[in-house]
């Protein structure tokens, strides 16, 4: 059971809030951080205005400015794919260095494209976790320095909360309650988001995330990093029914995921094939492997919708950019007359607009980060609790 700060506790620590429903469980601010915050930080009222979001959890350096009403004024992303491609995956030390080199320019460009000045900002939101420790520290320290210089509040938010918030960036009126699938390189989680804004964790991966399965599968197939988009492109030329890869649904009624067995099945399939067959059937291998992943994601998501009684589904995170997943979700949602939210591709992968959106909710709820806020590489979603 995750820690929960009830409204009464928040009222004592942060003053009365009119927006508790938007940020019900500030897990990442419970503990010693409360003890070191100044009285001014705890009780300072936030006057809604433009805010800057900063994201450095993995291999994208991103900054975004949201207007007073939450509209996205800019969304700048600098990718490190060229840095990590020759290693076949993210090298944490190189990621941290690249963030240091890029963060000031990315933030300045986000501000320039927004048409605002530093003096116009009223708050800063930064990814506090989960993610790579060194990468997170770059963003957290930069955000704290800006907040101190500009004399405006900062707030640390969960990367998972950012992905959840991205579902409402394009369509603020997307209905609640709904089921949210967060599917990325590091996470595969199903949540039930209540009308209050509170989330309940319905299921998660027991081993590898879907994005991890895509990346490792791409490596085995000899495709370039990042693996997800590479498999997506290759699969368009293949037959998704060519090879019967296993699909793990676990026990009946389970909303958890497991992709480790699928990776092993691909490995054994490739080992049993002559080299010329691997090359000749590369597209079929990619398409069949992809189908085994996305079919489970779709089936579990709609099972969660049925069991929860919701009539809406939001799918967010980097893997939500997969073209086959999007097509299957749209077909199923149409057939079952469900509302479906698939964020634009710019909001699927790691970005700072989603961090700013989650941070805006936190600031409206009265949350503030002290100046000794630290990165939390294992930070869970602070919107959610487990049941």
Regions found by a protein language model. Give the residues of each.
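Glycine-rich phosphate-binding/hydrolytic loop that grips phosphoryl groups
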Residues: 343-381
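Active-site neighborhood for divalent-cation/phosphate handling
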Residues: 129, 133-135, 143, 149-178, ...
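Intrinsically disordered, low-complexity segments enriched in serine/proline and basic residues
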Residues: 2-12, 24, 124
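N-terminal beta-alpha supersecondary unit
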Residues: 48-130, 159, 285
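Short glycine-rich phosphate-binding loop at a beta-alpha junction
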Residues: 118-127, 309-319
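A short helix-loop
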Residues: 38-51, 57, 64, 74, ...
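Conserved phosphate-binding/catalytic loops in two-lobed NTP-binding clefts
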Residues: 156-157, 313, 330-354
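A contiguous, well-structured pocket-lining segment that forms one wall/lid of small-molecule binding clefts
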Residues: 233-313, 322-336, 363, 383-387
């Amino acid at each position: 059971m995750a820690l929960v700060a009830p409204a009464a506790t928040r009222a004592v620590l942060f003053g009365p809030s009119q927006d508790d429903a938007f940020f019900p469980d500030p897990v990442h601010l419970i503990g010693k951080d409360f003890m070191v915050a100044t009285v001014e930080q705890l009780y300072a009222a936030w006057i809604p205005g433009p805010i800057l979001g900063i994201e450095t959890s993995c291999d994208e350096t991103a900054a975004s400015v949201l207007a007073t009403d939450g509209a996205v004024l800019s969304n700048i992303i600098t990718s490190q794919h060229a840095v990590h491609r020759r290693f076949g995956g993210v090298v944490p030390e190189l990621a941290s260095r690249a963030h240091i080199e890029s963060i000031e320019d990315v933030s300045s460009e986000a501000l320039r494209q927004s048409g605002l000045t530093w003096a116009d900002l009223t708050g800063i939101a930064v990814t506090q976790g989960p993610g790579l420790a060194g990468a997170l520290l770059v963003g957290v320290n930069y955000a704290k320095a800006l907040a101190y210089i500009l004399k405006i509040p900062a707030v640390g938010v969960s990367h998972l909360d950012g992905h959840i918030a991205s579902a409402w960036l394009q369509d603020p009126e997307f209905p609640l309650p709904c089921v949210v699938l967060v599917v990325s390189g590091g996470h595969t989680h199903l949540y039930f988001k209540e009308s209050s804004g509170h989330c309940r964790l319905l299921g998660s991966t027991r081993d590898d995330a879907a994005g991890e399965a895509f990346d490792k599968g791409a490596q085995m197939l000899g495709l370039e990093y990042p693996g997800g988009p590479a498999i997506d492109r290759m699969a368009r030329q293949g037959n998704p029914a060519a090879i019967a890869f296993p699909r793990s649904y676990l026990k009946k009624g389970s909303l958890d995921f497991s992709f480790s067995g699928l990776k092993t099945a691909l490995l054994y399939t490739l080992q049993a094939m002559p080299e010329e067959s691997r090359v000749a059937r590369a597209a079929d291998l990619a398409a069949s492997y992809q189908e085994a992943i996305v079919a489970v994601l779709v089936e579990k998501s709609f099972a969660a919708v049925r069991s929860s009684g919701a009539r809406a589904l939001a799918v967010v995170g980097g893997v939500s950019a997969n073209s086959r997943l999007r097509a299957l979700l749209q077909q199923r949602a149409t057939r079952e007359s469900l509302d479906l939210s698939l964020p634009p591709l710019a909001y699927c992968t790691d970005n700072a607009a989603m961090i700013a959106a989650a941070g805006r909710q936190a600031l409206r709820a009265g949350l503030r980060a002290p100046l000794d806020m630290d990165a939390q590489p294992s930070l869970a979603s602070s919107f959610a609790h487990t049941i």
